[in-house]
């Protein structure tokens, strides 16, 4: 969601539909608001189906006190108002009851964002607000106090979560990222001790400013690749393999050039013109490639057979990345044939240590690699091949997590693995 593209009513409806569609709230739960520069607050209504919200349902509360709209505002308007009073820098608030964050809420635990560099950078300070009755002035004071102390994410005891942002896309992306971290941690809890990154590893490294590639008319192949990248990025988002803030996909174009997703742009709203043409050191004017651009460039340079590369942090796969657990592919034939053996690399920065990471993967030898506390790196012959590999990886990880309460894994025997290698030509 890009800020400023829609009227506040439409932006609130689009965001709530997205939250509801991905089961991050219920028909009756959660509320969103936007504050205009003049102090006007737009907020979701009380007692209206979140799954069927329309722009006309959104309530407008003017700074002078007038109310416009056909419904009463959300019963939790008091805490939205209190947050804005405590934090003049905030332009939007998201409140919802997503499953994993509610699990932390009812256990009175904070989701540990130090398991991933990007999540830690996006979510900022996460704190608790003491319980109070929903809709009460006391709850508003409790939440506003937490925001006033500098938090961007406030967990509510036995309730849910409240997230603030400079605008609604910013707040939503922070919310979605925190819920994905919580999902990862819940799944990781079944696998072993969660590994937290030390402070020196949590610094988000920046790429040097890239040079500019000369403008050239796109070829037919480039046009097709841009469209294909967008289709598979949207599909990966729908499959929850990527989220709005995390994950990158690239495809080799020609020579040293490749096309890659942009940095800090909502993955679900990516369109072909937003895809970035890049090399290891340059890109199209006025665009910012993903922070993984240097890594992808190194992989293409090292491996002429690689046609597409994906970095992703899907929840089940990430659970293996943040614990010592081994992601075994000797589960079913599809997993072994598509993924082969999945190695795990000690934590490495995809920006500063791109060359080190790139040396560990190749299409023929090791097309899938886990990077501790970073996620998955997948190489394919083309975009479809890489996407399929990522999808199978997450499905395999999910099956392994789901098997934990049932008993120890019974892997395919060596004879079966040898047969798969012979029949399917697995190196």
Residue ranges and their predicted role:
Residues 1-427:
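Glycine-rich flexible loops
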């Amino acid at each position: 969601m890009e800020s400023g593209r829609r009227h506040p009513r439409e932006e609130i409806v689009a965001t709530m539909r997205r939250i509801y569609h991905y089961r991050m709230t219920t028909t009756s739960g959660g509320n969103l608001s936007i504050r205009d520069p003049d102090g006007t607050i737009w907020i979701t209504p009380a007692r209206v189906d979140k799954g069927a919200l329309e722009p006309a349902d959104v309530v407008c509360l003017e700074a002078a006190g007038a109310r416009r709209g056909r419904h009463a505002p959300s019963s939790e308007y008091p805490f939205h108002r209190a947050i804005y009073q405590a934090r003049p820098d905030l332009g939007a608030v998201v409140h919802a009851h997503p499953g994993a964050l509610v699990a932390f809420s009812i256990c009175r635990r904070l989701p540990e964002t130090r398991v991933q560099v990007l999540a830690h950078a996006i979510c900022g300070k996460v704190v608790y607000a003491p319980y109070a009755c929903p809709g009460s002035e006391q709850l508003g004071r409790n939440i506003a106090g937490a925001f006033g102390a500098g938090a961007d994410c406030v967990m509510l005891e036995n309730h849910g979560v409240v997230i603030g942002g400079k605008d609604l896309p910013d707040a939503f992306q922070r919310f979605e990222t925190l819920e994905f971290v919580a999902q990862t941690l819940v799944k990781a809890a079944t696998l072993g001790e969660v590994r937290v990154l030390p402070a020196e590893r949590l610094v988000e490294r920046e790429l040097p400013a890239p040079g500019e590639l000369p403008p050239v008319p796109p070829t037919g192949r480039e046009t097709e690749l841009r469209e294909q990248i967008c289709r598979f990025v949207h599909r990966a988002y729908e499959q929850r393999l990527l989220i709005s803030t995390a994950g990158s996909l690239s495809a080799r174009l020609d020579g040293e050039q490749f096309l890659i997703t942009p940095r800090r742009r909502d993955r679900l709203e990516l369109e072909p013109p937003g895809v970035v043409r890049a090399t290891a050191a340059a890109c199209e004017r006025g665009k910012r490639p993903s922070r993984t651009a240097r890594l992808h460039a190194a992989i293409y340079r090292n491996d002429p057979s690689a046609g597409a590369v994906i970095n992703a942090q899907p929840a089940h796969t990430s659970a293996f990345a943040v614990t010592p657990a081994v992601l075994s592919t000797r589960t079913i034939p599809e997993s072994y044939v598509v993924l082969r053996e999945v190695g795990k690399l000690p934590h490495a920065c995809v920006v500063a240590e791109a060359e080190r990471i790139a040396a560990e993967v190749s299409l023929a030898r090791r097309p899938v690699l886990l990077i501790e506390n970073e996620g998955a790196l997948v190489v394919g012959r083309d975009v479809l091949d890489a996407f399929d590999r990522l999808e199978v990886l997450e499905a395999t990880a999910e099956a392994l997590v789901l098997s934990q309460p049932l008993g120890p894994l019974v892997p395919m025997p060596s004879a079966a693995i040898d047969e798969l290698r012979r029949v399917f030509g697995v190196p």
